[in-house]
C-alpha cells in the first residue's frame, strides 16, 4: 500500500505483484525487464520518486494479475538490489522476497570484450562472477572483463 499523509495514493491490487524499494528512476527499467510495454492488458501503477525513510526517494510498481518469474527477479536484483517483491492474492501479501545479488550471473548479460569467447562462439554461454555488490561490479569468467552497474543497466535497457 502506498500512502501519503492525506491518504492512499494508489489503491490496493487484488492479485499480482508489488515491487517496492526500487531506486528512484529505475522503475521503467524494471518494466523493460518484465517485457511490459503497456499493451499487454495488465493494470499497472507506477510511482516514481516517492518519499522513503529508508532510501530518501524510491520507485514502486504494482502489476495486477502478473507474478514475477525467477529469471526476471534475478535481473531486477542487478539494477535494484534493495527491491522487495511482494506477491498479492485477494488483496493480501502471501509471499515476500528480497533477492540477493547472485554470486554468479549466467546467460543474462553479454561480455563487452569483442575478443571474448562468448562473442565468437555461438554455443558459449556468458558467465560473470560478482566482485562487488555495492556498487555492482561483475567479471567475465572467460576474459576477466569487468562490468559496472551502469553497464549492466545499459545492457538491460538495450
Swiss-Prot record:
Q: Where does Zn(2+) bind?
A: 111, 116, 140, 143
The molecular function terms in GO held by this entry are:
metal ion binding
Domain of life according to the entry: Archaea
Which cofactor is essential here? Zn(2+)
Presence of the UniProt keyword Metal-binding in the record: yes
The cofactor binding remark recorded in the entry reads: Binds 1 zinc ion per subunit.
GO cellular component labels: aspartate carbamoyltransferase complex
Protein's GO biological process: 'de novo' pyrimidine nucleobase biosynthetic process; pyrimidine nucleotide biosynthetic process
**PANTHER family recorded:** ASPARTATE CARBAMOYLTRANSFERASE REGULATORY CHAIN
Function, in words: Involved in allosteric regulation of aspartate carbamoyltransferase.
**NCBIfam families named among the record's database cross-references:** ATCase_reg
What family classification does the UniProt entry report for this protein?
Belongs to the PyrI family.
Query: What's the subunit arrangement here?
Result: Contains catalytic and regulatory chains.
* HAMAP family in the cross-refs: Asp_carb_tr_reg (MF_00002)
Stated name of the protein: Aspartate carbamoyltransferase regulatory chain
The species this protein was found in: Metallosphaera sedula (strain ATCC 51363 / DSM 5348 / JCM 9185 / NBRC 15509 / TH2)
Amino acid at each position: 500500500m502506498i500512502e501519503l499523509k492525506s491518504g492512499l495514493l494508489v489503491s490496493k491490487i487484488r492479485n499480482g505483484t508489488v515491487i517496492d524499494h526500487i531506486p528512484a528512476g529505475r522503475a521503467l527499467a524494471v518494466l523493460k525487464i518484465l517485457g511490459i510495454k503497456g499493451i499487454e492488458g495488465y493494470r499497472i501503477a507506477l510511482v516514481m520518486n516517492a518519499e522513503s525513510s529508508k532510501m530518501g526517494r524510491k520507485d514502486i510498481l504494482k502489476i495486477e494479475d502478473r507474478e514475477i518469474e525467477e529469471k526476471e527477479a534475478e535481473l531486477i536484483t542487478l539494477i535494484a538490489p534493495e527491491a522487495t517483491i511482494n506477491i498479492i492474492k485477494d488483496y493480501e501479501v502471501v509471499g515476500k522476497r528480497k533477492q540477493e545479488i547472485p554470486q554468479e550471473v549466467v546467460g543474462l548479460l553479454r561480455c563487452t570484450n569483442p575478443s571474448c569467447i562468448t562473442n565468437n562462439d555461438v554455443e558459449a554461454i556468458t558467465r560473470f562472477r560478482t566482485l562487488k555488490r555495492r556498487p555492482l561490479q561483475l567479471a567475465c569468467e572467460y576474459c576477466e572483463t569487468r562490468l559496472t552497474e551502469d553497464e549492466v543497466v545499459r545492457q538491460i535497457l538495450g
